[in-house]
Amino acid sequence: MGIEDINRRLRQLKKKRVDASIRNRKEAASEERARLAEGKPRVYSMAEEPADEAEADDTQSEQLKLLNYRIADYEKWDEKQKRHKQPSDGADLGELANSTYRSELHQLHRRGVVKGRATNGRISASGKVVLDDEPELVEKLAAAVQQTAKRRHEERQKKAAKDGGRATAGSLNDKNRHFNEKLDREFRKRGQ
């Protein structure tokens, strides 16, 4: 494939691009003319629509709404879902601690403890802002985290007692727990 073939292919692609943009502009203009020809939107009309038309319009508007959903909006929504997702029983304890900490900070803000307070900040020699922690807020946060940790520990102990003393950390369900126990037995056999 020589340079001439590549140039010819490039010209063809450019022509297709121009044709597509012209078609797109024509279609957009015809849609605009059709919208203007309809006059007022149906929302302002006092005429009652048949139920089938209204339902069809609802599904069509829902489809248009989904088509106009941007990737950035989805990523923001996904991040929000990840932040609010509660870890499962077998979750990593580091994730659980992080989730608890974030949740308690959020609760402090919601209760208005932090809202409206003057910050005790100063600017260091390097030009960075240094904020001094307020002892009462630190104490409240520590107490809330300890209370949550104690409650979760008690729940785990109750669950372990209910299961007959078997460890449930890291098990998603009974079948998974049985599999993990079988793996443990195999590792002990091979280790001896």
Swiss-Prot record:
Its main location: nucleus. GO terms for cellular component: cytosol; Prp19 complex; U2-type catalytic step 1 spliceosome; U2-type catalytic step 2 spliceosome; U2-type post-mRNA release spliceosomal complex; U2-type prespliceosome. Residues 49-60 have a biased composition (Acidic residues). It comes from the Eukaryota. It is found in: Nucleus. Keywords: mRNA processing, mRNA splicing, Nucleus, Spliceosome. GO terms for biological process: mRNA splicing, via spliceosome. Residues 18-41, 152-165, 174-192 have a biased composition (Basic and acidic residues). Involved in pre-mRNA splicing. Belongs to the SYF2 family. This is Pre-mRNA-splicing factor SYF2.
